[in-house]
From Swiss-Prot:
Annotated membrane topology: Peripheral membrane protein
Name by which UniProt lists this protein: Putative membrane protein insertion efficiency factor
One cellular component term from this protein's GO annotations in UniProt: plasma membrane
Organism ancestry: Bacteria, Thermotogati, Thermotogota, Thermotogae, Thermotogales
General function of this protein: Could be involved in insertion of integral membrane proteins into the membrane.
Cross-referenced InterPro entries: Membr_insert_effic_factor_YidD
Main location: membrane
Subcellular location: Cell inner membrane
Listed Pfam families: YidD
Family, as annotated: Belongs to the UPF0161 family.
Length: 79
């Protein structure tokens, strides 16, 4: 299942993302973050981290450098 999600994100990166103007406010981009989170923390934790990041990426967000955390926690981080 983890591999399937990574394939879906890579499909998005290759075929859908180039058709849109760049809008991600973070570094690494949300799609790269999602893949890194899945690879580092596995399916459930990576999915949680990736979805949480996508929700945070909006016009009201300050954005900036936001790497995948080394340690996983369900606690929300304050910036």
């Amino acid at each position: 299942m983890k591999r399937l999600l990574i394939m879906i994100v890579r499909f998005y990166q290759k075929y859908i993302s180039p058709l849109k103007p760049p809008t991600c406010r973070f570094e690494p981009t949300c799609s790269n973050y999602f893949i890194q989170a899945l690879e580092k923390h596995g399916l459930l934790k990576g999915l949680f981290l990736g979805l949480r990041r996508v929700v945070r990426c909006n016009p009201l967000s300050k954005g900036g450098y936001d790497p995948v955390p080394e340690e996983f926690s369900f606690k929300l981080r304050r910036r």
